[in-house]
C-alpha cells in the first residue's frame, strides 16, 4: 500500500477497508457488520450466527464467533477491552497511531473450503510491483508462514513461524490477487 496521501487512514482497520474498497472495489472487501467505540455498545442481537470482532487499531485483538449460542461474552469483553487500552504511540512510539481512537469492528465470518478459517495472503510490493508473497495458515492456534516468489516457487526462509505441514496450492485467482496488490501499491 502506498503511503502517499494514505498514511492517515491505513492505521485504522475500518478506514483502511474504505480506502482499499475505493481502489479495488467493495467486492474484494470482507463485509463490515458494524463499528463501535466500546464493547458495551455492541448490539449482539443484530449480529449473525457467526461473526468476527476485532479492534481497529492493533493486531491480535480478534475474537471469532463460530456459534453465537455458545459465544463466551465475558472472555470476548475481557480480550477486546484489553486491546482497546493498547496504545501503539505510547507503548511503542509509533507516531502514526498518536491520535487514533481505538474502536471495535464486526465483520462477516468467512472460511476457506477446508472449513478451517481463511488463509491470509500478503503481497510484498517494491516500486509498485509485487515481488514476493506469504501465506499464513492455521491462525490463530498453530500459525504457519510460507513465502513465495511471483512464479509461486516456495522460498527457503521463515519468519517467526514454521512452514505449513505440506505443500500449499497456488490460488486459482492468483493473477487477479497479484493485479489487485499492484493497484494498491501504486
Predicted regions span which residues?
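Short beta->alpha connector loops
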Residues: 34-39, 109-113
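Active-site rim elements
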Residues: 6-7, 166-170, 182
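A basic- and aromatic-enriched beta-loop-alpha substructure that forms the phosphate/nucleotide-
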Residues: 16-24, 28-37, 43-96
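Short beta-strand to alpha-helix junction loop
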Residues: 10-16
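Phosphate-binding site of ATP-dependent enzymes
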Residues: 47, 71-166, 178, 184
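Single conserved hydrophobic/aromatic residue that forms the stacking wall/gate
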Residues: 1-5, 9
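Amphipathic alpha-helical regulatory segments at dimerization interfaces
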Residues: 22, 183-184
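Short, conserved clusters of charged catalytic residues that mark active-site
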Residues: 15, 176-180
Amino acid at each position: 500500500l502506498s503511503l502517499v496521501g494514505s498514511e492517515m487512514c491505513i492505521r485504522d482497520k475500518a478506514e483502511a477497508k474504505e480506502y482499499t474498497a475505493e481502489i479495488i472495489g467493495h467486492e474484494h472487501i470482507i463485509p463490515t457488520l458494524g463499528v463501535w467505540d466500546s464493547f458495551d455498545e455492541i448490539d449482539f442481537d443484530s449480529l449473525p450466527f457467526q461473526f468476527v470482532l476485532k479492534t481497529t487499531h492493533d493486531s491480535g485483538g480478534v475474537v471469532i464467533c463460530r456459534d453465537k449460542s455458545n459465544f463466551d461474552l465475558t472472555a470476548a469483553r475481557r480480550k477486546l477491552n484489553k486491546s482497546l487500552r493498547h496504545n501503539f504511540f505510547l507503548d511503542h512510539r509509533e507516531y502514526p497511531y498518536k491520535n487514533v481512537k481505538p474502536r471495535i469492528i464486526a465483520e462477516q465470518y468467512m472460511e476457506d473450503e477446508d472449513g478451517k478459517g481463511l488463509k491470509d495472503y500478503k503481497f510484498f510490493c517494491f516500486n509498485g510491483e509485487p515481488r514476493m508473497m506469504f501465506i499464513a495458515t492455521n491462525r490463530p492456534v498453530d500459525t504457519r508462514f510460507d513465502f513465495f516468489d511471483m512464479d509461486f516457487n516456495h522460498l527457503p526462509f521463515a519468519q517467526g513461524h514454521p512452514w505449513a505441514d505440506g505443500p500449499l496450492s497456488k490460488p486459482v485467482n492468483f493473477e487477479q490477487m497479484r493485479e489487485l496488490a499492484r493497484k494498491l501499491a501504486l
